[in-house]
Amino acid sequence: MKTVRGFASATVGNVACGFDVLGFAITEPGDEVILTLHEERKSECPVSITAISGDGGALPLDPKKNTSSFVVLKFLEYIRTSKGIDFKGHIDLELKKNLPLSSGMGSSAASAAAALAAANELLGQPCSKMELVHFAVEGERVACGSAHADNAAPAILGNFVLIRSYAPLDLITIPSPEHLFCTLVHPHTELKTSFARSVLPRSIPLKTATQQWGNVGALIAGLLKSDYDLIGRALVDVVAEPKRAPLIPGFLDVKHAAIDCGALGCSIAGSGPSVFAFSSSKETAERVGQAMREAFLLPETNLKSDMWVSPICKEGAKVL
C-alpha cells in the first residue's frame, strides 16, 4: 500500500482583460488530495472516494461526478491507451477542501490539479505536466459544464498561462515579475459560475473588442517587461466586469478602496464573487487587502470576507 499527497493552490481566471484566455496561480490557499494505492481492485470502478472534508457535504461521492476523482479516471484511461500502462489496482481518494466553492478562486481546478499531481507520482510519473492539463480541463466540464482552461492550466503549471487556442489546446506560460503580489479577497457570499456566465453578451461591438485586445496585449507585455505601471494600466475589463459587477455586493467600493490604497489594479477573480488586486510589494498588498475587507463591511453591503496575500505561484500542482 502506497500513499501520495497532492496539493494545488487557488487560481484567478480572466485576470481582468483576459476573459477565458488568461489565468495565474497563487501560493495559498489550496486543496489537498490524498491517494492510496491498493494492489487489488475493490470494485468495477478503479477509484473510490473515501472522504471529503471542508465542503459542508456539497460535493458528490460518486467518482464519476466528482472533479478530483473524474480526472484520475481520465488519467488512468489515457495511460492505458497511450502509454501501455494497464492499471489493475485500486485507488482510494481523500479530498481536503480548503477553497470555498463557487468563489472565483478556481476551487474545482485546484482539486483536479492536486489529484492529478498525486496520481502521476503514484504511478511513476508517466505524464508531463502539459499532458495533465488536458485532464484538468475535462474536470472543469464536470464541475461547471464548460471545459475552460484559465484556472485548470495555471493550477497545474503555475505562473501566468495564456491560452492561445482551445482546439488544439495551445498554452503559453508567462513568468511573473519578481515583486508582483496578489491580494485575493473572498466575501462571504456565493455566485454560481453558470449564472455569472449567463449575464454576459453573446456578441460585443468591434470597438469594445479592440479595447479588450489592446489591454490583454499590454498586460502580457507588462508582465514580460516587469513594467508595473503598464500592468496597472492594462488591468481593465470592458467585456465581463461591467456585466458582473452588479452581481457582487459592494464591488465598486472595494475596487475604489484597492486603487486608493496603492494597488496597481483590481478586478473580479474569475466569475466572482472574489476580488483580486495586484501590487508591487507585499506591504502594499497587505494594506490593499485590509482596505478591501473594510469596503465589504460598509453598511450598505456589510459582508465579512477572507483575505490572502501571495506572490505568484511558480511551480503549480505538486506532491507534498
Swiss-Prot record:
Keywords recorded for this protein, A-Z: Amino-acid biosynthesis, ATP-binding, Cytoplasm, Kinase, Nucleotide-binding, Threonine biosynthesis, Transferase
Residues holding ATP: P100, L101, S102, S103, G104, M105, G106, S107, S108, A109, A110
GO terms for cellular component: cytoplasm
Keyword NAD: no
Enzyme class, spelled out: transferase
Keyword GTP-binding: no
InterPro entries tied to this protein: GHMP_kinase_C_dom, GHMP_kinase_C_sf, GHMP_kinase_N_dom, GHMP_knse_ATP-bd_CS, Homoserine_kinase, Ribosomal_Su5_D2-typ_SF, Ribsml_uS5_D2-typ_fold_subgr
Subcellular location: Cytoplasm
Pathway assigned to this chain's UniProt record: Amino-acid biosynthesis; L-threonine biosynthesis; L-threonine from L-aspartate: step 4/5
Residue ranges the record marks as coiled coil: none
Gene Ontology BP, a term: threonine biosynthetic process
Function: Catalyzes the ATP-dependent phosphorylation of L-homoserine to L-homoserine phosphate.
Family: Belongs to the GHMP kinase family. Homoserine kinase subfamily.
Protein name in UniProt: Homoserine kinase
Phylogenetic classification of the source organism: Bacteria, Pseudomonadati, Chlorobiota, Chlorobiia, Chlorobiales
